[in-house]
């Protein structure tokens, strides 16, 4: 009776209560249901958290567009999750992909999330949807300061459909190929972090570099007020940016848009970054612990491990910065906490607290030393999503292959794993390697194809014009601006070729402070 589609909806209204009692399986746990629903509410704070974190990291004249994009990405992705995303990621299908059987929440009522689950699928539905939302928000931030809003929403919709949903299925579905292989990933080191990091790398390559402005000591800065000195429209598309990065296209702007120096715009509001990261940290406690979908001793291990790892990550980053510069950095400490959260996400349900410490220290060390990775590889990935989430997720998966312990997994009374190198299970690292390489490759290639195809659609070119980039995306795409800017203002400071003083371009342009840029 339970598996009969929409059985409850066909009952007479007078017998609804009796029917629910009849259909509600005895194995469902009210405590587990309550905890997953509570976790859903807490995890939702990751949406404003990522938005504030990213908005504080960009120039002021593009900050509000990042906030708006995060809001719209949440709406677009959750609609996708409702229409068919949940079904593709969670319904029983092949070893690679789910089916459309539960699209539109069809056949989704009191059925268990998976056979033997203590919660119904309807309880998991919003919780799992917020994982997809967080992943899309992380990767879509790569459009910062030069990407157009509407194409970014289209790309996010396609990314969740073609990248996140299959990878979530591989990782967590009972018959997903990575799950059956034996690769360990508790809460999304692959589908969430590695996937979003490599997708952000592909998106950034398609968008190309930001224009370097207001830096008179840089030879590749814009130093002329003549619009003719800006790159032509033929150089401002996805295909040309790929050719330029691979060295197949020689253009007069290659110093600015090919391999070499990239724009360095300092975060406009470190306080906004701090608030955003605190919200992310808070949400991640339930992001990880809620993934168990039940409440027991292992739940406590997971939450404790999350706090330990992020704390070690923040402190490690702070110590390295102080050794290098003899000063602490608010932004650096926040990035260290993020690195710790990324590192513990795949491992939180499989390691003892000492393993969680390693899961915070090692990713923070690696990500800090690779802080200039974008400069080395010639990619202008504005918010360092690839560094923190892509590289950090891989490092976290490797650490998991070393420190995974079967006793922690078994603390819920049901889970059995062989563990990692710490218990002499040498094959585990091979399984981890298969997991993060397949996720990284699939995410990078499919996202690049998505961006290339969307860019070819009339009206959906993914990058703003260079003139629009100079004005700021807030002025181009939004009715409102943050305090201190007006719709008539164009905060452009461009250094003239023969002058030491900044000049403004256009008759109605107000000169703004450099920190307003």
Curated annotation (Swiss-Prot):
Role noted for this protein: Transporter for ammonium to use as a nitrogen source.
Extracellular side: 1-32, 91-118, 170-180, 294-299, 349, 406-432
Nucleotidyltransferase recorded as keyword: no
GO cellular component term of the entry, any: fungal-type vacuole
Gene name tied to this protein: amt3
Gene3D superfamilies: Ammonium transporter AmtB like domains (1.10.3430.10)
Transmembrane segments: 33-53, 70-90, 119-139, 149-169, 181-201, 273-293, 300-320, 328-348, 350-370, 385-405, 433-453
Source domain of life: Eukaryota
Membrane topology, Cytoplasmic segments: 54-69, 140-148, 202-272, 321-327, 371-384, 454-517
Topology with respect to the bilayer: Multi-pass membrane protein
UniProt KW keywords: Ammonia transport, Membrane, Transmembrane, Transmembrane helix, Transport
Gene Ontology MF terms in the entry: ammonium channel activity; methylammonium transmembrane transporter activity
An example Gene Ontology biological process: ammonium transmembrane transport
Keyword Translocase: no
Family: Belongs to the ammonia transporter channel (TC 1.A.11.2) family.
Subcellular location: Membrane
Protein name per the record: Ammonium transporter 3
InterPro entries: Ammonium/urea_transptr, Ammonium_transpt, NH4_transpt_AmtB-like_dom
Primary residence: membrane
Pfam families: Ammonium_transp (PF00909)
